Amino acid sequence: MDASMMAGLDGLPEEDKAKMASMIDQLQLRDSLRMYNSLVERCFVDCVDSFTRKSLQKQEETCVMRCAEKFLKHTMRVGMRFAELNQNAPTQD
C-alpha cells in the first residue's frame, strides 16, 4: 500500500490501520489477478485458433504479444486518467 493511502488512515488506532492496510493489499492482489486472468483469456480467445501443436505458431505468438501490449497500454492510460481526475477533484474536509 502506498503512502497516500496510509495518510488517510492517520486518525485510526494502529490495530485498525494494520487491518485496513491488510484489506487494501488483499483487494489490490485480487484486482491484479483479475486483470491478469482477463488479459490471458482475451488474448487466448482472440489469437489462438490452432490446437495441432503444443506450442504457439509464430502468427499466434505475435498476436498474443500485440494483444498483451495493447491491453497493458490501455490499462495504464485508464489508470493515468483516473489519477488526473482524482488530482482535480475537490477534497471534502
Swiss-Prot record:
Pfam families, per this entry?
zf-Tim10_DDP
Any one GO BP annotation for this protein:
mitochondrion organization
> InterPro entries per the record?
Mito_inner_translocase_sub (IPR050673), Tim10-like (IPR004217), Tim10-like_dom_sf (IPR035427)
Primary localization class, coarse: mitochondrion
Query: Which pairs of positions does the record mark as disulfide bonds?
Result: C43-C67, C47-C63
Q: Name one GO cellular component term.
A: cytosol
Q: Which UniProt keywords apply?
A: Chaperone, Disulfide bond, Metal-binding, Mitochondrion, Protein transport, Translocation, Transport, Zinc
**Gene Ontology terms for molecular function:** metal ion binding
Per the annotation, the residue ranges of the short sequence motif Twin CX3C motif are 43-67
**What is the superkingdom listed in this entry's lineage?**
Eukaryota
> Which cellular compartments is it found in?
Mitochondrion intermembrane space
Provide the free-text tissue specificity comment from this protein's UniProt record.
Answer: Expressed in roots, flowers, young cotyledons and leaves.
**Gene3D superfamilies, per the entry:** Mitochondrial import inner membrane translocase subunit tim13 like domains
PANTHER family, from UniProt? MITOCHONDRIAL IMPORT INNER MEMBRANE TRANSLOCASE SUBUNIT TIM9B
Q: What does this protein do?
A: Mitochondrial intermembrane chaperone that participates in the import and insertion of multi-pass transmembrane proteins into the mitochondrial inner membrane. May also be required for the transfer of beta-barrel precursors from the TOM complex to the sorting and assembly machinery (SAM complex) of the outer membrane. Acts as a chaperone-like protein that protects the hydrophobic precursors from aggregation and guide them through the mitochondrial intermembrane space.
Q: Which family does it belong to?
A: Belongs to the small Tim family.
Domains (record comment): The twin CX3C motif contains 4 conserved Cys residues that form 2 disulfide bonds in the mitochondrial intermembrane space. However, during the transit of TIM9 from cytoplasm into mitochondrion, the Cys residues probably coordinate zinc, thereby preventing folding and allowing its transfer across mitochondrial outer membrane.
Q: How does it associate, per the subunit comment?
A: Heterohexamer; composed of 3 copies of TIM9 and 3 copies of TIM10, named soluble 70 kDa complex. The complex associates with the TIM22 component of the TIM22 complex. Interacts with multi-pass transmembrane proteins in transit.
Recorded protein name is: Mitochondrial import inner membrane translocase subunit TIM9
What species was this sequence derived from? Arabidopsis thaliana (Mouse-ear cress)
